[in-house]
């Protein structure tokens, strides 16, 4: 019974770490990556559609993203969606493709991004800790229902080890992303 709770908690913790990883991938660090456009949705014939389902996104150079919509009539909508999004890059179009030139990050912007990263990481840590708390509460409830005390204690210890493992993983991701951003 306790093992099921712990495996469920581990699955949830993995998902929390994955969310943080995706959040980090969507932050631009001075290099062009298609993942910075993952959250951009375009109004395609009245339906909000993810940009990566409407166009081919490629990186021909280190600081340039090229968006090639399969339907050329959607180019103005794609431009509007990029401008509305929090990407912070102005698109330039030549009628067939849209180019996004990623500007060099200023030191001020770098420190701002590091703050954002730390905030998102803290949200991830809190999520992992909340999962631990909820699972601990479940273990304590099961203990009242008749699970032996030593089994409950082992479960709580194992849960704490999992929590430490995933919090450490988030911390390592923060360190790596921070180095990537602060690189000039």
From Swiss-Prot:
One of its GO terms (biological process) is translational termination. Keywords: Cytoplasm, Protein biosynthesis. Responsible for the release of ribosomes from messenger RNA at the termination of protein biosynthesis. May increase the efficiency of translation by recycling ribosomes from one round of translation to another. It comes from the Bacteria. This is Ribosome-recycling factor. Residues 137-158 are annotated as: Disordered. InterPro entries: Ribosome_recyc_fac, Ribosome_recyc_fac_dom, RRF_sf. One of its GO terms (molecular function) is ribosomal large subunit binding. Belongs to the RRF family. Transmembrane segments: none annotated.
């Amino acid at each position: 019974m306790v093992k099921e709770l712990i495996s469920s908690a581990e699955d949830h913790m993995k998902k929390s770490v994955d969310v943080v990883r995706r959040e980090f991938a969507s932050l631009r660090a001075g290099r062009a990556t298609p993942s910075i456009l993952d959250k951009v949705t375009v109004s395609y014939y009245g339906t909000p559609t993810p940009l990566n389902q409407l166009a081919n996104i490629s990186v021909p150079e280190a600081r340039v993203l090229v968006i090639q919509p399969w339907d050329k009539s959607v180019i103005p909508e794609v431009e509007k969606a990029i401008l509305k999004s929090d990407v912070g890059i102005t698109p330039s179009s030549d009628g067939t493709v849209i180019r996004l030139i990623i500007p060099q990050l200023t030191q001020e912007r770098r420190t701002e991004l590091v703050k954002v990263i730390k905030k998102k990481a803290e949200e991830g840590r809190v999520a992992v800790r909340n999962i631990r708390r909820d699972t601990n509460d479940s273990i304590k409830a099961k203990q009242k229902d008749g699970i032996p005390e030593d089994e409950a204690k082992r479960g709580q210890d194992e849960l704490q080890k999992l929590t430490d493992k995933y919090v450490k993983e988030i911390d390592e991701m923060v360190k790596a992303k921070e180095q990537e951003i602060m690189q000039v």
